[in-house]
């Protein structure tokens, strides 16, 4: 098996594994086992995530998609993993994960992806808060989710460049959330 892809845009192994795992929970237990093993191999030792994002036109957060996947894979062990993966998250750092992306031109097909980034980050932050309800990150994550939704939700219908696909992220990419 090859290595993971952590680049942004639509090439994101953690995002793909999250969706595949959600499907496999109902249809293919052996696939869940394989996905969990790969996720642990590829992401289990990640520490001190820098979160160098956004890059300008992606709609997925590589850092938060990874955290979302690991919340499902690790269960009760997720809190310990999260604390070393994003050790300053409770303090709102790295700031790039807590600050909604600014969309300068919603008619530009690439820049409009940043509304998608805000929506997918909101989904990830809400899921992380739900996975860690007693953790100090929970209220911080909920606030970040609300901020990201507020930045992009009102613009779902502003221009065709976003309208034709952004609603898919708003309705939640995963039936488990």
Positions of the model-derived regions?
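Aromatic- and glycine-enriched pocket-lining scaffold segments that form the walls
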Residues: 3, 8-43
